[in-house]
């Protein structure tokens, strides 16, 4: 019989942290799961750390990419091999509360494709909770994702596998904000609901984070703005220009990016954002002229 939930974990050079993540999975009150851990061609002993769990529990499955494909590529590898009707994508350095799987699974109804939960943000250096992701996602959330009124973290969503496959999985060319890209696309075909309970500890800080840096942040923002440009400009132009201005300000901070990176970002910015700004400036000019005509 196939398991009810497939947990998919990408791992790259995670030998120091992945064991605690997998131990938390073993502690789940919901037992009918498989966990596919995808080693993204690591250079350290990540494989050996994973194989210790595979050896003691057959629910763990080891997969390995022949070349490094990034977190999204590893997630797609896991999705391709998943057997369950429900999938949960999880990061290799975060922790599940023991009732995560049971709580999300029992919260599903026939008219829902995605169940999300809340997440605590834990600072590694301070070893304490510093924030909470307590966004509420109900029904069709496509509009709310574009306007940034809601957010869905990678870890916090149990999803029907067929809707993941329907949108083609994760975008492997997305530099950052992969979960934003994924759920903008997923929300076009899926209906969401939120279990208002903290069930995950999301760790930030320290020297072992997977994705960090101004360069990747801006490149990811520009990727999203370019990919969904028409949707932003039609429904939420202010969100589009707000993110554009934030990206521009980060590019100007040369302390955070080197010259080569800055040149690449400026080129992306010119190609993606500048034409829309020209349209905005033109519209503002028409508005000013209209106001002058009204005053006369």
Residue ranges of model-derived segments:
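Conserved donor NDP-sugar-binding/catalytic core segment of glycosyltransferases
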Residues: 99-130
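C-terminal subregions of glycosyltransferases and related glycan-biosynthesis enzymes
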Residues: 203-296
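Cell-envelope/extracellular polymer assembly enzymes that use nucleotide-activated donors
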Residues: 3-6, 34, 181
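Short, well-formed alpha-helical segments that are part of the catalytic scaffolds
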Residues: 14-27
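Conserved nucleotide-sugar donor-binding catalytic segment
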Residues: 135-225
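Short aromatic/hydrophobic "clamp" motif used to bind/position activated sugar donors
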Residues: 87
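Glycine-rich, basic loop-to-helix element that forms the pyrophosphate-binding segment
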Residues: 65-82
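A conserved acidic beta->alpha catalytic loop
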Residues: 24, 31, 39-48, 67, ...
């Amino acid at each position: 019989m196939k398991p009810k939930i497939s947990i998919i974990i990408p791992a790259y050079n995670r030998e120091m942290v992945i064991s605690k993540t997998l131990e938390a999975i073993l502690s789940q009150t919901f037992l009918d799961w498989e966990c596919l851990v995808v080693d993204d061609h690591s250079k350290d002993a990540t494989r050996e750390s994973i194989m210790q769990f595979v050896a003691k529990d057959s629910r763990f499955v080891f997969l390995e990419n022949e070349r490094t494909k990034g977190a999204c590529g590893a997630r797609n590898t896991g999705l391709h091999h998943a057997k369950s009707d429900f999938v949960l994508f999880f990061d290799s350095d975060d922790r599940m509360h023991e009732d995560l799987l049971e709580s999300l699974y029992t919260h599903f109804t026939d008219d829902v494709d995605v169940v999300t939960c809340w997440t605590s943000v834990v600072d590694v250096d301070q070893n304490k909770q510093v924030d909470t992701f307590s966004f509420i996602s109900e029904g069709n959330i496509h509009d709310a994702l574009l306007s940034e009124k809601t957010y869905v973290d990678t870890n916090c969503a149990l999803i029907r596998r067929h809707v993941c496959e329907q949108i083609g999985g994760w975008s492997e060319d997305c530099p950052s904000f992969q979960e934003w890209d994924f759920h903008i696309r997923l929300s076009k075909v899926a209906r969401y609901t939120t279990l208002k309970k903290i069930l995950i500890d999301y760790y930030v800080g320290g020297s072992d984070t997977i994705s960090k840096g101004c360069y990747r942040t801006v490149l990811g923002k520009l990727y999203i703005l370019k990919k969904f440009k028409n949707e932003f400009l039609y429904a939420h132009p202010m969100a589009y220009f707000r993110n554009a201005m934030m990206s521009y300000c980060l590019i100007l901070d040369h302390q955070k990016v080197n010259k080569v990176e800055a040149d690449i970002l400026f080129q992306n910015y010119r190609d993606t954002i500048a034409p829309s700004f020209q349209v905005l400036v033109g519209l503002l000019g028409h508005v000013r002229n209209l106001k002058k005509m009204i005053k006369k």
